[in-house]
Amino acid sequence: MCNIPAFGEKTCIQNQENRHNRVFHIADADDRSFDDYCALFEGVAYVKKEEYRTPIHRFAALSKGKQGVFINYYSFIRELRIVIEDFCRYFSYVDTCKNLSVSPQITQIMLEDFGMSYAIRLSDGRFVVIDGGYNFEPDRDRLFCCLKNESPESKPIIAAWIMSHPHIDHYQCFIGFVDRYADEVLIEKVMLNFPEADDLEHYPDLSYKDARFTDDVSEITNIPRMLERIKRTGAQSYTLHTGQRYRIGDADCEVLSCMDDTIHVSKNINATSLVIRMCLGGQTILWTTDAGFSYARLPERYGSYLKADILQVPHHGFQCGEASSEIRGYDLIKPQVCLLPVSDYSAYTFFCSYREGTRYLMNAANVKEIITGSTQRTITLPYTADDHVRREMKEKCARGERDNGARTWVYTGLSTSCKEDFSFTLLNMTALPATVDIELFFEAKECAIRFIKAEIPASSLRTLCIIGEEADGDALFFNGDSLKRKGIPEDVPFAVRFLCDKPMVVSHRHHAASYASMTF
């Protein structure tokens, strides 16, 4: 075993991912560092089995006995990553492709609200399943029906079941699916890279228990249950590491990110998510699952190599990590078609369209279609969106905002002599908190009061006095028109304007709004 760091590096972080995987993160590396570590392992009898490079990324895979070593170097960020896996199966990976008999296709399984379940039919009639969704009877039944209906064989063959990360809405379907349908399908391989079930040091949320469920859905309980089901199927299990390339039927798959790359920077389970670049049917599909682009530094590590025809929108469009990094990624990916694993309601009315990164994607000129999960949808590869669907997407965005209220509300005919005229009710029906700017106008211009701010929590109804303690009347560092500086004139008429960063419903017990406007 080599001692790492071996060449006097000042910054080296070591993490134990689970019982069989260790990862070393070396900063301020260069091309020579990559070559030196390859030579170091080769010098102690490791055999280099694979090596490739792109303009800003180098990868090498070495083996010795049952141990595998995977080395990645990213020149733009000057980071070297070394992963050592005991009992490694990567080098014995074999996939036997059958006769090409059908067109490849992707089915986004119907979702109750959100989750992730994809069935990818290969050209030989076998399937790649990504995640599967919740361990709910409808989720597993819809997945099985899709496999059964689209398979050219009487018994569907799952060439690979890929599990992206340990969250209830992604992998737990596998447990119930095996319990119900193990005898009616053949599962050849399972692919994943999960932490240990009790790794609360790195991932405290593994013990999270959701009060909405009567069953124990915590990962501490369900990761072992999932592993037991894998053994029950007899499927070969592979631990995926960044840089590895797999040929599954006629699908070429490359792992761009996994827990290897984020264990040292985030305790967020979503950050461990697999990112897989798949080439199938003459197109490139980027599966980002729930990855946070900023945690994984995907734009910096891969640049234009991220370009894809079809993008599965990360984290259901809910955003994970910084929006700015997501937007940089979308500018590099430039997808024409997006798969968004949420219902129309969550996508356009309740959540996604109000996230900065997802809103940017919805307005990107290159995006011709966003396919949500309200209905089950199958696309045959290569797939090109119809010309009219972009217009329909824009109409859904606009309708979603209208359904939530307006961005600007104006009330007139109020009087400072009436205490109740300062009391308003605000309804925020989105899943994100809203900021409201409030302005008061009087007949005398110099009395105007500006930049009163109020925060309205997500999915909530709030009644507030706009000049009371529940509103911030002096929100700016310097506000010459602040409530505190000017005060309220006595016994004069006034008007109030609400400017909302989310669509909002503003009401008053005794007055109707004089004006409300929607901006989109």
Regions found by a protein language model. Give the residues of each.
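Gly/Pro-rich, tryptophan- and cysteine-flecked surface segments typical
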Residues: 396-520
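Amphipathic alpha-helical segments
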Residues: 28-50
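Ser/Thr-rich, low-complexity intrinsically disordered terminal regions
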Residues: 47-68
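Compositionally biased P/S/T/G-rich terminal and signal peptide-adjacent segments
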Residues: 1-24
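Core dinuclear metal-dependent hydrolase active-site scaffold
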Residues: 88-156, 231-307, 377-397
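Binuclear metal-ion centers of metallo-dependent hydrolases, dominated by the metallo-beta-lactamase
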Residues: 95, 184, 189-191, 197-254, ...
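Active-site metal-binding motif and surrounding structural segment of the metallo-beta-lactamase
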Residues: 125-128, 137-195, 301-318, 334-338
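Active-site environment of divalent metal-dependent phosphoester hydrolases
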Residues: 114, 136-137, 166-172, 197-200, ...
